[in-house]
């Protein structure tokens, strides 16, 4: 008798995706981040659901409803901080996942990569609207500043901003719709993640060498299920340590002050995971130019498959490209630091140089290094 997991219509899908899936035998821990992102998404949806049961999306009660969750709801404080720090863990895993994809040439799977870029935009949108919900000072002013960027669009900009706001400023209508968006978007992310997996399983996984591994595959279960469980335990441990020992480490103290449209915080800045893009936005003195640079800083990822000039897929055997990759990582860390600093002399010029280097690395230096490496292979 054939095993039920191979014959049952639903079990067969699960079996082909997580049990009998042929997987390269040499994939490293950098391949753990996909499953960790799935875990993060589940944690966020569950904690978010319980928070939504007690939260009220109204300007007069939003801030106090979050306080109520932390003080009066059973284990409300841990649910709230798991959700807030879960977002940080989500982005850590996301950036590691993207970095590994870039390093090992996973962008050769065009469809999977492009769905990934769409997923990134959706996750960033979800995190942004979610940050507005506690209705603290940084929530309010962050929403005002970031939505206002759309007014830089010629002709329709102002109308578009007022349409998103649902009025002439960030107010009750804005908060209500942002809550609606924040509730629906994770389910869209879930659907997109399934599509992402479908496309990945069409081609099979890449591996660190970038060389086809069809002749050397092993079943996903038990080898990689065990490996994923180890990663999951480390993720949960880190998340719990952050939540229980330093819940406000990555947050902004200004968000513990209720939103006040009449008082602007000294330094308006987004959460840490958006600071690199915020630094690029601020480094251009022109509003429209800044908005375009901000958009391109993320959208540039969609062009990476076209910018791949190397004859090798992975960077494993390409020392020049490796060096430039780590320069890019250092550059992004520099931009993240600059994004959190005030707009004054030393920081502004460093931010501008780091922004130029970011685009220069991706558009010019890395493709040129790949061409040089191609020449060196003939020696």
Swiss-Prot record:
A ubiquinone binds at residue 201. This is Cytochrome b. Component of the ubiquinol-cytochrome c reductase complex (complex III or cytochrome b-c1 complex) that is part of the mitochondrial respiratory chain. The b-c1 complex mediates electron transfer from ubiquinol to cytochrome c. Contributes to the generation of a proton gradient across the mitochondrial membrane that is then used for ATP synthesis. It comes from Balaenoptera acutorostrata (Common minke whale). It is found in: Mitochondrion inner membrane. Pfam families: Cytochrom_B_C, Cytochrome_B. Binds 2 heme b groups non-covalently. Heme b b562 binds at residues 83, 182.
